[in-house]
């Protein structure tokens, strides 16, 4: 959300929202038409007018707009996969496909591939290539009281499955992930099968870290995670390797232009058409996106290039505008509205795009909630160069989470963690014993750029010297977090940053 908003409401909005057509318009213009999700093929406008005619330009601009909005999350997902598994010389490279990479550390400001990262749980990542055969995810026993999860994300950014504390418990287990063409039975010794709509699946591992010395136990748990191909479980012959792929280079400037359509074309070859997307996939064929062969935007006529770029740029503008609209679904939008499986998110691709723009790979609401603070109690944008802020939890009214909660600081411009002398990027429930209590037993946190002084640093969450936002994460939330019985406290601005 980024435009006219009820600023007070924005304090509750989650850390991910980007584009939305005007809801409820009786006859919306082309730019605010019904969600591009998957219009029926019969109703779709497929460019058919003669080359370079005004009608064709109009049709192509509309297609460029719709294609950008429908494909945005898909292409954003590729950005992370390219960094993690393709660009071997890049700083974020983690290893080949089907190879688990676990880091026994938490995110810092030096990590730049994923915006709005969680720094409570050391991560593990594996991108599964399921073209040749399914992959088996094995997990060890995890002690009671420690949260862990494996989040399964397809190429659309749908969360289509979970393994972990909430869903399968902390016992050891083996879970098979299959691609869209796999038809085999459930193998013996497998606890559950997760079927993906796409051949490439990102699995995000999160393992709770209680405190710095606890990192050794996290390492032991991570060492118990494994990924193995199905043929090793069944002791059968290995299948033939899948064809080598010519992965397109990810370059931010290129993707801002027609390179976006080249990457989308590459990805759709790996994503079988599902009924919900038949309409938009048929329309994209008119410009060669998703058709056999490699798309080369240089083969477009000048008129077609101009029209597609105009539509794409309208889509970019719309995303930027809608990323600050807190009510684009007809009610106050939270992160719980933005992440989930296909059935939950439905045909409205605005939801997955908003999530991908401001915090890709967010959890489904049952797994975690992400209220975000972007404004203070008076509705003013947060800016630590202008004010200091306090956040008070009354006695007995800490965030209700069965696993844990955390409050993390982010730079308002980069959407990354904030460098600071204490190397403190968050305050969470495992730190409660070290926090100073108010006289009545409540807890008041201070969010500001300058240190409030040694005596007050225990409750200080350092902010950048400028715009910022803070995300409150509740892992495995209690019902009170859903039903409204727990109220999210507001950030209160104090006139000047506190001086040491």
Range-by-range predicted roles:
Residues 33-500:
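A compositional/structural signature for long, glycine/proline-rich flexible linkers
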Residues 24-27:
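Bacterial signal peptide processing site
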Residues 11-22:
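Bacterial N-terminal signal peptides
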Residues 1-7:
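N-terminal secretory signal peptides that target proteins for export/translocation
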Residues 29-31:
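Auxiliary, metal-adjacent structural segments of Zn-dependent hydrolase domains
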């Amino acid at each position: 959300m980024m435009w006219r908003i009820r600023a007070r409401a924005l304090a509750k909005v989650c850390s991910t929202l980007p584009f939305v057509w005007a809801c409820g318009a009786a006859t919306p213009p082309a730019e605010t038409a019904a969600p591009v999700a998957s219009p029926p093929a019969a109703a779709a406008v497929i460019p058919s007018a003669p080359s370079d005619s005004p009608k064709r330009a109009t049709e192509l601009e509309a297609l460029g707009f719709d294609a950008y909005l429908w494909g945005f999350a898909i292409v954003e997902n590729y950005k992370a996969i390219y960094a993690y598994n393709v660009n071997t010389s890049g700083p974020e490279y983690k290893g080949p496909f089907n190879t688990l990479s676990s880091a026994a550390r938490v995110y810092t400001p030096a990590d730049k591939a994923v915006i709005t990262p969680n720094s409570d749980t050391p991560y593990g990542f594996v991108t599964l290539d399921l073209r040749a055969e399914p992959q088996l995810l094995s997990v060890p026993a995890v002690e009671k009281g420690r949260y862990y999860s494996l989040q399964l994300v397809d190429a659309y950014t749908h969360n289509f499955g979970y393994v972990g504390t909430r869903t399968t418990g902390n016992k050891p287990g083996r879970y098979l992930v299959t691609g869209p063409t796999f038809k085999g039975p459930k193998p013996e010794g497998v606890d559950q099968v997760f079927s993906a709509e796409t051949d490439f699946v990102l699995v995000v591992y999160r393992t709770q870290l209680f405190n710095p010395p606890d990192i050794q136990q996290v390492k032991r748990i991570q060492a118990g995670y494994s990924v193995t191909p199905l043929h090793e479980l069944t002791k059968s012959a290995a299948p033939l390797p899948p064809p080598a792929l010519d992965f397109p280079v990810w370059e931010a400037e290129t993707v801002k232009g027609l390179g976006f359509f080249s990457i989308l074309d590459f990805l759709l070859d790996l994503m079988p058409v599902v009924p919900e997307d038949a309409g938009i996939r048929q329309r994209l064929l008119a410009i060669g996106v998703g058709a056999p062969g490699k798309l080369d935007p240089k083969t477009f006529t000048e008129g077609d290039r101009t029209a597609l770029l105009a539509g794409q740029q309208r889509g970019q503008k719309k995303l930027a505008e809608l990323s600050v609209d807190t009510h684009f679904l007809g009610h106050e939008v939270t992160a719980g509205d933005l992440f989930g499986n296909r059935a939950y998110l439905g045909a409205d691709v605005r939801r997955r795009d908003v999530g991908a723009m401001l915090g890709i790979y967010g959890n489904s609401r049952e797994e975690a909630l992400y209220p975000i603070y972007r404004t203070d109690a008076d509705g003013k944008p947060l800016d630590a160069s202008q004010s200091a802020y306090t956040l008070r939890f009354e006695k007995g009214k800490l965030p209700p989470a069965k696993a844990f909660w955390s409050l993390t600081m982010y730079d308002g411009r980069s959407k990354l963690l904030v460098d600071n002398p204490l190397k403190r990027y968050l305050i969470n429930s495992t730190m409660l014993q070290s926090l100073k209590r108010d006289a009545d037993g409540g807890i008041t946190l201070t969010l500001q750029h300058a240190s409030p002084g040694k005596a007050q640093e225990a409750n200080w969450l350092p902010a950048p010297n400028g715009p910022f936002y803070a995300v409150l994460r509740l892992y495995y939330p209690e019902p009170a977090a859903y039903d409204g019985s727990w109220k999210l406290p507001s950030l209160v601005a104090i006139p000047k940053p506190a001086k040491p």
